[in-house]
């Protein structure tokens, strides 16, 4: 399953956990993706994986149930 927003393309970013003793271990920062039903430009309804930033910005129009 893709961990990428279908609207803006935001995906996982590599980083490090840093402990109190300053040891570094690798980790991933993943976007907060939600599976929602969206009305597309051509008027069809389909399920998309969209990040919460795009949802809050109003870049997608949710389909009613």
From Swiss-Prot:
Q: Which GO terms describe its molecular function?
A: structural constituent of ribosome
Query: Which keywords does the record carry?
Result: Ribonucleoprotein, Ribosomal protein
The cellular component terms of Gene Ontology attached to this UniProt record, alphabetical and capped at eight, are:
ribonucleoprotein complex; ribosome
GO biological process entries: translation
Domain of life the protein comes from:
Bacteria
Which Pfam families does this UniProt record tie to the protein? Ribosomal_L28 (PF00830)
Q: Could you say which protein family the record assigns here? A: Belongs to the bacterial ribosomal protein bL28 family.
> What HAMAP family is this protein classified in?
Ribosomal_bL28
Give the PANTHER family listed for this entry: 50S RIBOSOMAL PROTEIN L28, LARGE RIBOSOMAL SUBUNIT PROTEIN BL28A
Q: What is this protein called?
A: Large ribosomal subunit protein bL28
